[in-house]
Amino acid sequence: IIDDTINGAITTADNIVGRIGII
């Protein structure tokens, strides 16, 4: 469960960064 939560948070942050356009 912990791993899934961490992965989910990373994915969410990745999507936000992608939307902003910052690499």
Swiss-Prot record:
Transmembrane helix as UniProt keyword: no
UniProt note on tissues of expression: Expressed in skin glands.
Family: Belongs to the Frog skin active peptide (FSAP) family. Septenin subfamily.
The species this protein was found in: Osteopilus septentrionalis (Cuban treefrog)
Keyword field contains Acetylation: no
Top-level taxon of origin: Eukaryota
Role noted for this protein: May act as an antimicrobial peptide.
Compartment(s): Secreted
GO cellular component, one term: extracellular region
Keyword annotations from UniProtKB, A to Z: Secreted
Name of this protein: Septenin 2d
